[in-house]
């Protein structure tokens, strides 16, 4: 090992990349008292939003609430820079309610940079990291995590393009789309991590030399148009409907600026025909690139090819900031040549005279398949090396921020020689996402979805603090101020729920007749306010209107109380399921099992189980390649083995009794 006498500086943790994952990771480690350096290619593009300047949406908003509950910052910045807020899926149940904020991308970046600069223990450096410094012999074993791969080394630091070495006890890679990034417009390409910014070189080769598998993914972004050249009056306006809703649980941050409208237009037959006639000129259909793009954010070419029966597709026009005329054309990501993109835009109603400020482009980049990571987001091969964000194959600022926080927390615990914190999938969307990433061989950008969780009624945004803030406080990410806010809210909720469960109204009360008309059901004798609230169509607002509920309670308290009461039966059943899973996770597995003989297991599961010989069912469930079907088969096998063992004991006892009886021995 080199003595590193020429090292420029030494830190506890180095974070490589200044996007949403990197910022959360760096703030987390610094907050936990570790000297931290964040390296990025461009300090003027910290936490940049190169695609849609928006935060939240289905499942994504739940992630943002969870990050905030753990002391992260994405929710606070989304609230303070929001241009417009809307509640999605409002007509459906609370499990899928989603807050979405259109944000001011420049202001977001400015505020994040300021936050980083004001964070104690955190230093910022502008440089391209091209290599990793590795000690060949690992220092210690992985803590409380199962891995069939042996570590081959321990991270010591990083090396920059111009040869400077910086030492660190842990390194977190959050490189986004920059590793060997290449942007495409039509059949033309250039090396870039995103438009106007250079690609990162060297680090992919460094990872490959260490034995890591890397592959390629792609994403894309639509054109930007000058607002002043759009006929907004002819378009459908979408106003904010949730200015009083927030991602953060801190009431001191519940402030909204003046809201801006978005607008909606649609593709036309001219749009579709132009695309069909020129598919061969796009990077994908022209065969210039073959990397997988995000399934849930397809290009307009993909939409028209895959949904050829649809006559039109919605296109949303969204502002990029208060002080810029740039409009983001959501739904029109395209790989068409630049000269053809303006023609495409002008086929849309309201945009026939528009001016295009920035063309759409696709970006292709290297990523690290996350099956090479532990649930702590530490790599299996190299101790102290963590990976988070788009580098792990995800797409979205929210997914990146959540991973960054987890990687930062566990990097700090690694440095302090503490056990890693693992987020079970049944307790958070963070856990669901990481569980999916490390266990599934994903070959397309991963987006979090409510449908990916079996426990979505419990994993709501409104109760993210209840689920995660105690953990955040315990590990040091949540400060005393945030903890006090949490305790006050929970106390208010419990008091109000208790009151509603106890207070009754009688059928003879004057208010009863009005309530019967509202709820469509009669009151016989008397009813508690809680049972009244459980009736379809009855809400806290109904109780407030009749002065039966406390209107002075904050909105989040009132909504949380209503959800807890209204869905108490469902919540109880789902909590019971989770407890059963936890109980099963502690169940011991026999030692030295030949899993090859269990034919109901998949071939991959047999190989992984044989290689690791997990001690508990919970350890088996954490292994990549062991599916839910395999786990069910393993449980059935365990039950059969227990029955056989029990039957064998009975036969053995009967044989002993018979033997002693023949010998004339009394018991």
From Swiss-Prot:
Binding sites annotated in the UniProt record for FAD: 17-22
Listed PROSITE patterns: GIDA_1, GIDA_2
Chain sites annotated for binding NAD(+): 293-307
Gene3D superfamilies: FAD/NAD(P)-binding domain, GidA associated domain, C-terminal subdomain, tRNA uridine 5-carboxymethylaminomethyl modification enzyme MnmG/GidA
Names of the cofactor(s): FAD
GO molecular-function term, one example from the UniProt record: flavin adenine dinucleotide binding
Keyword Glycosyltransferase among UniProt keywords: no
This protein's UniProt keywords: Cytoplasm, FAD, Flavoprotein, NAD, tRNA processing
Locations listed in the record: Cytoplasm
GO BP, sorted A to Z: tRNA methylation; tRNA wobble uridine modification
One cellular-component annotation, GO: cytoplasm
Domain of life: Bacteria
Main subcellular localisation: cytoplasm
Assembly: Homodimer. Heterotetramer of two MnmE and two MnmG subunits.
Homology family: Belongs to the MnmG family.
Function comment: NAD-binding protein involved in the addition of a carboxymethylaminomethyl (cmnm) group at the wobble position (U34) of certain tRNAs, forming tRNA-cmnm(5)s(2)U34.
HAMAP family: MnmG_GidA (MF_00129)
Protein's UniProt name: tRNA uridine 5-carboxymethylaminomethyl modification enzyme MnmG
Taxonomy of the source species: Bacteria, Bacillati, Cyanobacteriota, Cyanophyceae, Synechococcales
